[in-house]
Regions:
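Feature activates predominantly on carbohydrate-active enzymes
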Residues: 26, 36, 41-44, 48, ...
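Short, well-ordered secondary-structure micro-motifs within conserved domains or adaptor modules
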Residues: 58-80
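Substrate-binding cleft/loops of secretory-pathway carbohydrate-active enzymes
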Residues: 291, 295-319, 362-367, 395-403
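Catalytic domains of carbohydrate-active enzymes that cleave complex glycans
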Residues: 409-590
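Bacterial Sec-dependent N-terminal signal peptides
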Residues: 1-18
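Structured mid-domain segments that build the active-site/substrate or prosthetic-cofactor binding neighborhood
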Residues: 221-222, 333-432, 438
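Aromatic, loop-rich ligand-recognition surfaces of beta-strand-rich domains
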Residues: 598-662, 677-723
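Acidic, His- and aromatic-enriched active-site or binding-groove loops in soluble protein domains
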Residues: 263-281, 309-328, 408-415
Length: 723
């Protein structure tokens, strides 16, 4: 979608090349070499000159160069790969390339800085119409700060946007799309697990083959199998020379056999085994490049072994908080120690940075103030490649703005972040921009004032007394009301504003379900509005596990709005036989019978046990008739939260002698979606009882297919309902 804008014109300098005069083309585009990149660059220039002025510049390959021609694709050594030179002098405009997509990126820079074109999101750009297009004398050379730049954004599906933001895709670089968590693709546990369990991690006293287990990297047999597999991959992908040989997803699942432990202790980090193994591959294939993760248990570098130059370290800051730059909180400083440690032994670092709330992607995540400082930090510490994993799907918190700012800052970390934000907002939100800018400033200030961390598994409920308190939400809504009024006559801008408001609407719904009383009719109306807007604009999901909006709205009505069910155990006293983990005990006495159901984030309302059974008794205060008992469980595989083996319900009159009412068995469930699982036992005939005992049998250890293979599984429950 095109938005015609009246933007501040670039400073006027003496014209050297006239491309268009009074809507008529005065120049032509000459390809120095006729290849795909140069031709795409030429077509991009041709398109936007035409849309700006009406003049159509012809494109010729290897044609005669004359006055007013635009030469695209000559080589230059004034920049590094992907870089470019724009030289306008002596009546000719030359856009030179330092390699790869340099010609395209040079054209983009020219269009932005001289013609006032801004490509802001998928199929959406702004430009300043002018019947005359003249390029002043200039000589500009630019190189990217990072040789690889990638971020998540639904806008990346638009190839013009992706080129405009100067972004790459990992599949362009990594052979066979082997770019992260590749162990099980290279040495499949489904093939080798049963016959060779010794290839896999030794955890808690035995070998644990599985698709999330790691390799026993001191086993001499593995290397040749993997090397042969890698050789075949490179032969099948002759145009690519990089591959990732990296741990499967999951924490602390590294091998702890005596030989691996000996290396880990000597190196001071499990990363020692990994770097040693990668170095052997790098020596076997000296003309290839090998990437491996420094992630979770391998984040900190080894003390002695150093990666060879063709070993790339993909360092991930997944465990850090996001409310301040990495230098300013303890989790960030721990990562910084790792980054500085790797920087001392390698100049080949790929940083994987996170700016996402995995559990609630449609929730406010005000991290814009830290983007520039963190990217500068990565650059100072030898990072040459950068991936920004952010909330990138449509409807997530200011996804378009975040992707725009990151694209610009990954190319040049010295740009002014606030200016980038305001430029984007003027183009993307039009007359609503001042209100949304004010909203972001207020939200960020409130976050910092609250002292509450911003986490990648966050919940709006965490911030309901801070940046999302009732008074602030009222002020935010007033700003959005004004923003919607300002663009009411522009359907495109109104859509942008309404989508930007979704995180605030979602937060209000999430907070409302944790509060007793209140206007439930108003909450239901808000839920209807949220669902309608999401459906209207095609918002696909609410979290990393792809839970759909329509399912959220349906479950919200079932769980959090009045449904006529009366819990006879409401407010019951809880007597613990096997209490939950200590961190959940402060809420446990009330959370199981307070009538407030937990949401999709385990950090609020849920009560958890890890690796052991649960056993507790509810004292209902008097004899009551019991017909049915239901307990609500959470299923969230990514957090090691699995369904237990079973739950059994017992009844008693005296809290001493209990009789079994029934048992609910849980089937294995590998579904990655976050969901709520009710465990119900319905009695064939009612019984009288004062006490209800609940006994949950743990699954024990996470199974071989799970991220936490070999470690104790969690289960979480919240509400026990007696009918």
């Amino acid at each position: 979608m095109l938005l015609v804008a009246c933007l501040a014109a670039p400073s006027v300098l003496p014209a050297q090349v006239c491309l268009v005069s009074k809507g008529k083309a005065q120049a032509r585009i000459v390809l120095a070499q006729d290849n795909d990149v140069n031709r795409k660059a030429a077509q991009l220039l041709q398109r936007f000159v035409r849309e700006t002025s009406g003049g159509e510049l012809p494109i010729v390959a290897n044609g005669r160069r004359s006055k007013n021609c635009v030469v695209i694709g000559e080589s230059t050594d004034e920049a590094t790969d992907d870089g470019y030179v724009i030289d306008c002098s002596r009546g000719t405009l030359a856009i030179k390339t330092a390699g790869d997509k340099g010609a395209i990126y040079g054209v983009v820079a020219l269009l932005e800085k001289q013609l006032g074109v801004d490509y802001l999101a998928k199929d959406f750009y702004t430009l300043t119409p002018s019947a005359d297009v003249r390029i002043p004398q200039m000589h500009v050379a630019e190189s990217p700060a990072f040789r690889f730049r990638q971020t998540f954004s639904y806008s990346n599906n638009d190839s013009t946007y992706r080129d405009w933001m100067r972004l790459q895709e990992h599949r362009e670089m990594f052979a066979a799309d082997m770019w992260v968590h590749t162990f099980d693709r290279l040495l499949p546990s489904s093939v080798y697990g049963k016959s060779h369990p010794e290839y896999y991690s030794f955890i808690n006293g035995e070998r644990r083959p599985g698709n999330h287990s790691q390799w026993c990297l001191t086993n001499p047999d593995i290397f040749e199998i993997v090397a042969h597999r890698i050789d075949s991959i490179f032969k099948a992908n002759p145009d690519q020379n990089m591959i990732s040989v990296s741990q499967n997803d999951g924490n602390d699942t590294y091998c702890q056999c005596p030989e691996c432990r000996k290396v880990n202790e000597y190196e001071g980090s499990p990363a020692g085994c990994y770097v040693r193994f990668l170095n052997r591959l790098a020596e076997r294939f000296p003309d290839k490049h090998f990437s491996t993760l420094a992630y979770l248990f391998t984040m900190h570098p080894p003390k002695h072994v150093k990666p060879l130059p063709n070993v790339n370290i993909m360092l991930c800051d997944i465990d850090t908080k996001r409310e301040v730059p990495l230098t300013d909180n303890e989790s960030g400083r721990d990562f910084l120690r790792a980054l500085e440690g790797w920087a001392k032994i390698s100049n080949n670092i790929f940083v994987w940075d996170y700016g996402i709330n995995f559990d609630n992607v449609v929730a406010p995540f005000p991290n814009f103030h830290i983007l520039k400082k963190n990217i500068q930090l990565f650059k100072r510490n030898h990072a040459t490649m950068l991936f920004e994993q952010v909330n990138g799907t449509l409807g997530t918190d200011f996804a378009e703005l975040r992707a725009y700012m990151l694209g610009k800052l990954m190319w040049n970390p010295e740009l002014d972040a606030d200016s980038l934000m305001q430029r984007f907002m003027r183009g993307y939100y039009g007359a609503a921009a001042p209100y949304l800018y004010r909203y972001q400033q207020m939200l960020t200030g409130a976050l910092l004032a609250s002292g509450t961390p911003l986490w990648i598994y966050d919940s709006p409920i965490t911030h309901k007394n801070g940046m999302l308190n009732a008074n602030l939400r009222k002020a935010y809504n007033e700003l959005f009301d004004e923003a919607e009024k300002a663009v009411a006559a522009d359907s495109a801008m109104l859509a942008h504003v309404r989508i930007a408001r979704l995180p605030l609407r979602y937060s209000e719904l999430e907070i409302a379900r944790t509060e007793s009383g209140g206007d439930k009719a108003a909450v239901e109306k808000s839920l209807d509005t949220f669902g309608t807007i999401c459906a209207l604009y095609g918002v696909p999901t609410l979290n990393e596990r792809n839970n759909k909006v329509e399912d959220y709205c349906r479950l919200y009505r079932q769980r959090f709005l009045p449904n006529g069910t009366k819990n006879k155990a409401a407010g019951a006293k809880v007597i613990w036989n096997i209490p939950p983990q200590e961190r959940y005990q402060p809420i446990a006495d009330k959370a199981l019978t307070d009538g407030l159901y937990g949401g999709t984030t385990f950090v609020e309302s849920w009560v958890g046990w890890q690796g052991e059974d649960a056993d507790f008794v509810l004292d209902m205060g008097e004899q009551k008739q019991v017909n049915k008992i239901t307990t609500d469980f959470l299923h969230q595989l990514g957090q090691w939260i699995l369904q237990p083996k079973s739950v059994a319900y017992y009844a008693s009159d005296d809290a001493k002698n209990f009789r079994l009412l029934g048992t609910h068995e849980f089937p294995e469930d590998r579904d990655i979606s976050v969901k709520f699982v009710p465990a119900t036992v319905t009695l064939s005939a009612p019984v009288q009882a004062r006490y209800i005992r609940v006994v949950v049998k743990t699954l024990g250890l996470c199974p071989s297919w799970h991220y936490g293979v070999g470690y104790p599984a969690w289960f979480f429950l919240d509400e026990v309902v007696v009918e």
